[in-house]
């Protein structure tokens, strides 16, 4: 379902309206552009451009959506997530937990209207899981973004008032 909400897959029927735009009715190119500007996605398994540094991966996400690198924003997000000292490294040089935090920074780069997170704390220790949830919730409030988290992580389930449980 997260892939449908992100506009990566099209539903067979229905609409998905984000910021007064039905993304189902958009062309593939327009959907990609819309997603870049309005939807932040944190996948369970991180995906990066391996030849680019951590900082360059964040700048690329911003540049593809806006035509600007927003280096200052990228550095601020890395600092907020406690990985500012990893900015010049390649993603493959990071631990799985560090890669997950870079994925979260990338999802937040363009101040999305909707933030979708698939198991954002699955690779993190307790301290960093807490940091990530605080950052996701505070920034989603700051940007007035809807936040949808899919998780099995009992450490964070109770931190949210609104929950949907599927069995």
Stretches found by the model and what they are:
Residues 115-118:
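Catalytic Walker B motif of ABC-type/P-loop ATPase nucleotide-binding domains
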Residues 90-100:
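Conserved ABC ATPase signature
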């Amino acid at each position: 379902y997260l892939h449908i909400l992100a506009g990566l897959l099209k539903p067979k029927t229905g609409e998905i309206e984000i910021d007064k735009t039905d993304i189902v009715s958009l062309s593939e190119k327009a959907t990609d552009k819309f997603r870049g500007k309005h939807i932040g996605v944190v996948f369970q398994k991180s995906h990066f451009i391996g030849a680019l540094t951590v900082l360059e991966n964040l700048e690329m996400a911003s540049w593809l959506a806006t035509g600007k690198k927003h280096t200052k924003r990228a550095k601020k997000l890395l600092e907020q997530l406690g990985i500012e000292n990893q900015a010049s490294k390649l993603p493959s040089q990071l631990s799985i937990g560090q890669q997950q935090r870079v994925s979260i920074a990338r999802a937040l780069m363009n101040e999305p209207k909707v933030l979708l997170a698939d198991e954002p704390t699955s690779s993190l220790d307790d301290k960093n899981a807490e940091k990530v949830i605080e950052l996701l919730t505070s920034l989603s409030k700051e940007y007035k973004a809807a936040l949808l988290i899919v998780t099995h992580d009992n450490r964070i389930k109770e931190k949210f008032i609104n929950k949907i449980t599927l069995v």
